[in-house]
Amino acid sequence: MSDLEALHVRAKALNLNGLLAHWGEAAAAGWLATLIDWEEQERTRRSLERRLRAAHIGRFKPLCDFDWTWPKRCDRAAFEALMSLDFLKDATNAILVGPNGVGKSTLARNIAHQALIHGHTVLFTSAGQLLSELAALDSDSALRRRLRHYAGPRLLVIDEVGYLSYSNRHADLLFELVSRRYEHNSTLVTTNRPFAEWREVFPNAACVVSLVDRLVHNAEVLAIEGESYRLKEAQERAEQRARQRRKAKS
């Protein structure tokens, strides 16, 4: 394929119909390749901005600022494998398990941002927000529409499963969503509870075993152990303020 033919293919992919209608004239111009480059770059930029707004990732600490020495246990190689996004190609899931404050949400947001940069659709939500929203819908048609909304993204991040307890209906709704996404799109879950304790998160729910089974099938489970980094930062801030007060008095 010649360079000019390759430019024609790119122009068709961009639906530049006006340019294509005058291709014979445009082909002789020295600016044709630059024009198509500009259009592709601008569409890529606008697509990323649109997907960033829709993803609701929020502000987060970039990996360059993450203290890998703080967790007592965290398989960095396994996390970096998740950052490669290979699990999205296979439509498998990822689970980050660990106590409060060890960086699960930060790591999940970095994976979500990486997926966005690479052109994937992403949606980030907390378990509480997701399940409260679904449970509040008062018609089957509205529920089906909202389930399709959450089933659609290439990556759905459900943060903070286990921080609250939920009813049987909440459990059924989560199972329905996970089932819709199963082997079609990837789901990333952060939780402070090992799976053996999920019956306490969804007490008396009959679907808990099936829910966990669908989530963990072929999933990458990354366990993180350690003390709360947020507590560490709070203690450091308190100590700094105390030093400043002592200095002001001296």
Descriptions of predicted regions:
Residues 2-7:
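Extended, charged alpha-helical coiled-coil/arm scaffolds that mediate oligomerization and mechanical coupling
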Residues 8-59:
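Interdomain "pre-motor" coupling segment immediately N-terminal to P-loop NTPase/helicase cores
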Residues 15, 66, 159, 215:
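Short, conserved catalytic/metal-binding motifs centered on acidic residues
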Residues 16-19, 41, 87, 155, ...:
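Generic structural signal for secondary-structure transition and capping sites
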Residues 25-29, 38, 56-57, 69-72, ...:
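Conserved phosphate/pyrophosphate-binding and hydrolysis machinery centered on Walker-type P-loop NTPases
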Residues 48-81, 89:
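Clamp-loader machinery-focused feature within the broader ASCE/P-loop NTPase space
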Residues 74-152, 199-201:
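Conserved P-loop
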